[in-house]
């Protein structure tokens, strides 16, 4: 099976400009290719991982990746399939975000070894050197307005209003391909299927300006089996930055993937062989309640993104919380595992009587209910049941001098911080 056949078998090929010519290029020699990442935030997220890992698979097959950080295009904003104009970021912000994204990409691509080691480029380096007049003369003249308006990615915005700034975005992305081809012999661009219009602007410019053929391959935008856009947890993006989405939260995200999606996601997001995945699928279908596919997904992706130690910690947090063994975890581990539960910062004037604190922290709705909860054995401090109405919280209840975990019943948690 050649690399293109494997990408197809994994569900990673959505559209190509000329499949036969691309397969020929990929099987006859080394291809230099690129994927672009605009710094629209200070971190990449799971949605980016499809293109990143596809790029990694091609590198493992001997091809040479260029990771393009859009320091210039990030200042403009991509209008593709967006309902409204993006807010423009300052140059300083985009520069800072670009640096963070560079660091994240180095965890997935090999920038050190071999003749196909990855190269990092920033389109600000060439766009900052081009005058507006030169850009219009040397690039703009190759694009008709009719061609630009025909792109599905901007049609909707043409009706509701689009600035010239965003309208010109596709020409900038097209010029990226031309520049990389001219300087580094890059002949293939990879990106999400929503980028098709911008990406083919590059092949158009290559054809008209340099009389060369470029290839485009898009990866699918991933949705779950209900059609919901993938990569969100409770409406929030699942970030690759551990400070924005902890390894534990990422682990839980994968653990909660629906059965109908789990095997498909193993093909897309892991480097397990297709034979290994087929074996996992057989075992998974025989005992879905054991969630083998989800557990494998969680292990593989968290290890890939954050490392083996982070995976082991996420697994340990999961197991200890499930067993109610709060005291077996550090304050930092508890902050990861209980990041979504109510948090109350204890004030110096607060009563440390347990009944009072249950009401103050919003754990019980009233003192009467709080007393009943304590007497009925429904209240746990750091995993230990407390039934003393006169119990006073003390330093002994602080884990690492930072927090106390109170549980009401089986599932209602609150964290007291000091």
UniProtKB/Swiss-Prot annotation:
GO terms for molecular function: ATP binding; RNA binding; tyrosine-tRNA ligase activity. It comes from the Bacteria. Residues 352-418 form the S4 RNA-binding domain. InterPro entries: aa-tRNA-synth_I_CS (IPR001412), aa-tRNA-synth_Ic (IPR002305), Rossmann-like_a/b/a_fold (IPR014729), S4_RNA-bd (IPR002942), S4_RNA-bd_sf (IPR036986), SYY-like_C (IPR054608), Tyr-tRNA-ligase (IPR002307), Tyr-tRNA-ligase_bac-type (IPR024088). A motif ('KMSKS' region) lies at residues 229-233. One of its GO terms (biological process) is tyrosyl-tRNA aminoacylation. It is an enzyme of class 6 (ligase). A motif ('HIGH' region) lies at residues 39-48. L-tyrosine binds at residues 34, 169, 173. Keywords: Aminoacyl-tRNA synthetase, ATP-binding, Cytoplasm, Ligase, Nucleotide-binding, Protein biosynthesis, RNA-binding. ATP binds at residue 232. Gene3D superfamilies: HUPs, RNA-binding S4 domain, Tyrosyl-Transfer RNA Synthetase. It catalyses: tRNA(Tyr) + L-tyrosine + ATP = L-tyrosyl-tRNA(Tyr) + AMP + diphosphate + H(+). It holds the Pfam family SYY_C-terminal. Its EC number is 6.1.1.1. Its main location: cytoplasm. GO terms for cellular component: cytosol. Belongs to the class-I aminoacyl-tRNA synthetase family. TyrS type 1 subfamily. Homodimer. Catalyzes the attachment of tyrosine to tRNA(Tyr) in a two-step reaction: tyrosine is first activated by ATP to form Tyr-AMP and then transferred to the acceptor end of tRNA(Tyr). PANTHER family: TYROSINE--TRNA LIGASE, MITOCHONDRIAL, TYROSYL-TRNA SYNTHETASE. This is Tyrosine--tRNA ligase. The gene is tyrS.
